[in-house]
Each structure stands twice: as C-alpha cells, then as structure tokens.
C-alpha cells in the first residue's frame, strides 16, 4: 500500500477523525461534515475486523505511513519493554517528521515531512533528511539557519508539545525531553484495535 496523497478532508470525513488534528474538516461551514459518497451520512455498525481496520487506517493516514513502514514500527514497539499499545504510539511520535511538527516548526505533519525531505532539519547538529528516522530522548532537533526565513516556517505559530523543550525559540531549536504520555496523544484513536490487527498477522 502506497502513501495516501489524496484529499485529507475526504479521508478525515470517511474515518470520522481529524487528520489535521484541529477538527477543521468538520467545521459547520463546510459543505459536508460526514463521509463522502451517496451513503456517507449513514451510520454503519462495524464488525471487530472493520473496527481494527479503521483504527489502523487512522494512524497510518495521520502519520503518513504505508503498510510496510507501519509494520516495521510495530516490530520496534514490540521489542520494547512496557505496554505495547503505548509503545506503538510513542514510536510513531519519535519519528523525525512527527517531532518537527510537534516542536511547532511546521503547520502540519505533511509540511514537516517536506522540511525533512528537503534537508532543512538537523538532529544533534547533523543533517538528517529521512522523515522516518527515529529520534532518541535527549536529542536536539533544529532547523538550518538559512531555512528560518522561509514563509512556511515564519508563519507557523504552533506551540511545542509538552514533551518537547523549546531550547531556542528564535533559532528553532528543540529537544525531545521525554516520551509522550497517552493523555498527550490523539484521543480519538483506539490503538488496542491496531495491536489486535497486527497480532493476528504476525
């Protein structure tokens, strides 16, 4: 399965979940706040399998992953001590593109991914252009000095997440101070269903 590049608004309405994480897709001013298609406004009771699939898709589309990437991260979470469901979310949040977004350096996860892809991001002072790179606690994330004048960056007003320390606001330097707690992560995802899905396959 390749990475989804279509309309975030349509996908959010289909999943009943804000992929932009601000519920903008469901604002009353929009033409439709329900799923696309002829029967998009009808409630359908999902089977256990269907619920597992929906919850997996929520995380895949939220973090911009394909199935192969998601499986790899699931295996990483599986190898860590602790609660698997929380481990999975923490691994997803440890991706470099996710941390660039969480640090408030980009307005969306897609924009954060582009910043990493185009070599605007430093990890511990070294250029890293792989969005999927996993960042360890204590590492610093920064934007290149010449990138700070980009309108995308200058116009981003997002505040950093509580688990990220803003070392230098003007120079866009942040530090992953700790792994996030469950209460700091998307509430509208039931990651237990995702674990059930992969336990069945692996």
From Swiss-Prot:
* Biological process per Gene Ontology, one example term: ribosomal small subunit biogenesis
Q: Which Gene3D superfamilies would you find in this protein's record?
A: Ribosomal Protein S4 Delta 41, Chain A, domain 1 (1.10.1050.10), RNA-binding S4 domain (3.10.290.10)
Q: Name one GO cellular component term.
A: small ribosomal subunit
Keywords, ordered alphabetically: Ribonucleoprotein, Ribosomal protein, RNA-binding, rRNA-binding
The leader peptide range reads: none
Q: Which residues form the S4 RNA-binding domain?
A: 94-157
State the source organism's domain of life: Bacteria
Query: DNA damage: present as a keyword of the record?
Result: no
Q: Which GO terms describe its molecular function?
A: rRNA binding; structural constituent of ribosome
Q: Which InterPro entries match?
A: Ribosomal_uS4 (IPR022801), Ribosomal_uS4_bac-type (IPR005709), Ribosomal_uS4_CS (IPR018079), Ribosomal_uS4_N (IPR001912), S4_RNA-bd (IPR002942), S4_RNA-bd_sf (IPR036986)
Q: What PROSITE patterns would the database entry show?
A: RIBOSOMAL_S4, S4
Q: Which NCBIfam families match?
A: PRK05327.1, rpsD_bact
Q: Which family does it belong to?
A: Belongs to the universal ribosomal protein uS4 family.
The record describes its quaternary structure and partners as: Part of the 30S ribosomal subunit. Contacts protein S5. The interaction surface between S4 and S5 is involved in control of translational fidelity.
* Record PANTHER family: 30S 40S RIBOSOMAL PROTEIN, SMALL RIBOSOMAL SUBUNIT PROTEIN US4M
Q: What this chain does, per the record?
A: One of the primary rRNA binding proteins, it binds directly to 16S rRNA where it nucleates assembly of the body of the 30S subunit. With S5 and S12 plays an important role in translational accuracy.
Identification of the protein by name: Small ribosomal subunit protein uS4
Which species is the source of this protein? Ureaplasma urealyticum serovar 10 (strain ATCC 33699 / Western)
């Amino acid at each position: 399965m390749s990475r989804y590049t279509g309309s975030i608004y349509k996908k959010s309405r289909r999943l009943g979940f804000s992929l932009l994480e601000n519920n903008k897709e469901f604002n009353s001013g929009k033409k439709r706040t329900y799923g696309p298609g002829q029967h998009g406004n009808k409630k359908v009771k999902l089977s256990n399998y269907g619920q597992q699939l929906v919850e997996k898709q929520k995380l895949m589309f939220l973090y911009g992953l394909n199935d192969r990437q998601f499986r790899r991260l699931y295996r990483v979470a599986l190898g860590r001590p602790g609660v698997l469901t929380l481990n999975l979310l923490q691994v997803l949040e440890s991706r470099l593109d996710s941390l660039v977004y969480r640090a408030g350096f980009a307005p969306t996860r897609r924009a954060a991914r582009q910043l990493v892809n185009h070599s605007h991001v430093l990890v511990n002072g070294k250029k890293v252009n792989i969005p999927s790179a996993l960042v360890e606690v204590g590492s610093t994330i920064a934007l290149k000095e010449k990138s700070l004048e980009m309108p995308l960056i200058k116009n981003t007003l997002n505040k950093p997440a509580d688990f990220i320390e803003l070392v230098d606001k003007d120079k866009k330097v942040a530090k992953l101070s700790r792994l996030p707690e469950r209460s700091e992560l998307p509430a509208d995802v039931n990651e237990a269903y995702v674990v059930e899905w992969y336990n069945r396959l692996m």
